[in-house]
Amino acid sequence: FLHSSRTKPSKVKKADVPEHLKDKYTDEINDLTAEVLKNLEFLGVDYLIPIGGDDTLSYGVRLYQEGVKVVAIPKTMDNDVPGTDYCIGFSTCVTRTIELTNNLRTVAGSHERFLVLEVFGRYAGFTALLPTMAGAANRCVIPEYEFDISTLAELLSEDRLKNPSRYSIALISEGAMFKGGEMVFKDRTTDAYGHAKLGGIGDLVSEE
């Protein structure tokens, strides 16, 4: 088993280059794939089995193109790896989301409120859609379709009136967008894979 890391070997910042390689790689962004290939050969790795999401697996494709024998296993709660029906971790995400919303129903009902929950998922809406289909919420909003806040408010109001406990629940995917709007980012700084941190659309929906 090799150690896990959030570093993308093909795009390593100068400050993150290992000490013994700093003299060799001096650019602001460095591709250390040659070192990865060298280490795999040194370790006698015949097959590499990367387990992860689209970032991990996309680099697995790079190594495959370099001649490494790769067998990829999709593992991401987002369930957003193309070419596969199921990702390890997604069922746990759905289960936990359902448990969380069920735990909050008493609070929502006792105060007769609208409950808005923002869930992970980045650009895919599975983490909001599947729990809603399983009864965790009345409505969900996903990144694949821009939504009109007025329509959502009307639907939630109707759901609330039909509920004897006078509450309704909406699951909002973190990548969801208002009609004509853009994705909401909590932090514009990016991680090693170039992703900015999504977050905040749930708060905006609550305010509306």
Label the predicted regions.
Residues 9, 57, 76-81, 147-149:
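Short gly/pro/ser/thr-enriched loop/turn and capping motifs at secondary-structure boundaries
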Residues 79-81, 85, 188-193:
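Short beta-alpha connecting loops at secondary-structure transitions
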Residues 12-16, 59-63, 82-84:
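Short, conserved acidic/polar surface loops in the N-terminal third of protein domains
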Residues 7-8, 53-55, 76, 175-177:
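Short glycine-rich anion-binding loops that position phosphate/pyrophosphate groups of nucleotides
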Residues 1-41:
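Glycine-rich nucleotide/cofactor/substrate-binding loop typically near the N-terminus or early
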Residues 65, 76-79, 86-91:
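Short alpha-helices
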Residues 10-14, 80-81, 178-183:
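Short acidic/His/Gly/Ser-rich catalytic and metal-binding motifs that mark active-site loops
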Residues 29-32, 38-41, 47-52, 60-62, ...:
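Accessory alpha-helical/coil subdomains and C-terminal extensions
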